[in-house]
């Protein structure tokens, strides 16, 4: 990951900190910063980091390695959105009808690409474990009524919402589990309630 030579070193370092941290989920080491901005001296990088800290752009804990916090990103993470947790799904009723909403779940806004028409379903069972979707997970769903082959969707089958991989073929719809112990569900038609855009799991 190399920063273009189009700004002064301090700006290059700051931009690299943001880019690296967003990509990896943790800040870079001083040596990684040196390599990215073509500096040989770690002391020079430390000097730039100190000046960025004085400007209030970053915060460093000198007692811990890589303990560098980018204020801009920290503020983004503190912005929360409320996503409704949907319980029982009933045919003919809007998915986000008040009667369907069990609770609200707060999530940092930077964890999702947008907050338009999102809802959460609690995952029950192990039919999607090979896609990394486990029993008890919170599935974050973008409300949509259409799907393309290969999408992981929430479909309504006989008044029950199910999370499966969607395929339309030979005039039928195949809802494919991601677990070799389960058979696919083959139907002529079904209601698509939304598309999976994320998973939240508490440890």
UniProtKB/Swiss-Prot annotation:
Q: Which residues form the active site?
A: 127 (for autocatalytic cleavage activity), 164 (for autocatalytic cleavage activity)
Offer an example of a GO molecular function term for this protein.
Answer: serine-type endopeptidase activity
Q: Does the keyword Transcription apply?
A: yes
Q: Whereabouts does the entry annotate DNA binding, in residue ranges? A: 30-50
Q: Which transformation does this protein catalyse, written as a reaction?
A: Hydrolysis of Ala-|-Gly bond in repressor LexA
Q: Which InterPro entries does this one have?
A: ArsR-like_HTH (IPR011991), LexA (IPR006200), LexA-like (IPR039418), LexA/Signal_pep-like_sf (IPR036286), LexA_DNA-bd_dom (IPR006199), LexA_repressor (IPR050077), Peptidase_S24_LexA (IPR006197), Peptidase_S24_S26A/B/C (IPR015927)
Which Pfam family, an example, fits this chain?
Answer: Peptidase_S24
Keyword Cell inner membrane listed? The answer is no
Q: Which UniProt keywords apply?
A: Autocatalytic cleavage, DNA damage, DNA repair, DNA replication, DNA-binding, Hydrolase, Repressor, SOS response, Transcription, Transcription regulation
Q: Which GO terms describe its biological process?
A: DNA repair; DNA replication; negative regulation of DNA-templated transcription; proteolysis; SOS response
User: According to UniProt, where does the site described as Cleavage lie?
Assistant: 91-92
TM spans, by residue? none
What positions belong to coiled-coil segments? Answer: none
Domain of life assignment: Bacteria
Say which enzyme class the record assigns: hydrolase
What EC number(s) is this enzyme filed under?
A: 3.4.21.88
**Matching PANTHER family:** LEXA REPRESSOR, LEXA REPRESSOR-RELATED
Assembly mode: Homodimer.
Q: Which family does it belong to?
A: Belongs to the peptidase S24 family.
Q: What does this protein do, in the record's words?
A: Represses a number of genes involved in the response to DNA damage (SOS response), including recA and lexA. In the presence of single-stranded DNA, RecA interacts with LexA causing an autocatalytic cleavage which disrupts the DNA-binding part of LexA, leading to derepression of the SOS regulon and eventually DNA repair.
Write the protein's name.
LexA repressor
From which organism does this entry originate? Clostridium perfringens (strain 13 / Type A)
């Amino acid at each position: 990951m190399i920063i273009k030579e189009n700004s002064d070193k301090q700006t290059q370092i700051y931009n690299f900190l943001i880019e690296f941290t967003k990509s990896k989920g943790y800040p870079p080491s001083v040596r990684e910063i040196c390599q990215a901005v073509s500096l040989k001296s770690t002391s020079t990088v430390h000097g730039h980091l100190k000046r960025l800290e004085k400007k209030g752009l970053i915060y460093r804990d000198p007692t811990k390695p890589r303990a560098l916090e980018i204020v801009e990103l920290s503020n983004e993470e503190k912005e929360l959105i409320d996503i409704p947790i949907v319980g029982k799904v009933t045919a003919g009723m809007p998915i986000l009808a008040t009667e369907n909403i069990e609770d609200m779940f707060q999530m940092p806004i930077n964890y999702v690409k947008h907050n338009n028409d999102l809802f959460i379903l609690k995952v029950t069972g192990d039919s999607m474990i090979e896609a990394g979707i486990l029993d008890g997970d919170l599935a974050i769903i973008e409300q949509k009524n259409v799907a393309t082959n290969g999408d992981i969707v929430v479909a309504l089958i006989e008044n029950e919402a199910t999370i499966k991989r969607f395929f339309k073929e030979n005039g039928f719809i195949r809802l494919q589990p991601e677990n070799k112990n389960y058979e696919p569900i083959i139907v002529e038609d079904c209601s698509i309630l939304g598309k999976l855009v994320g998973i939240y799991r508490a440890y």
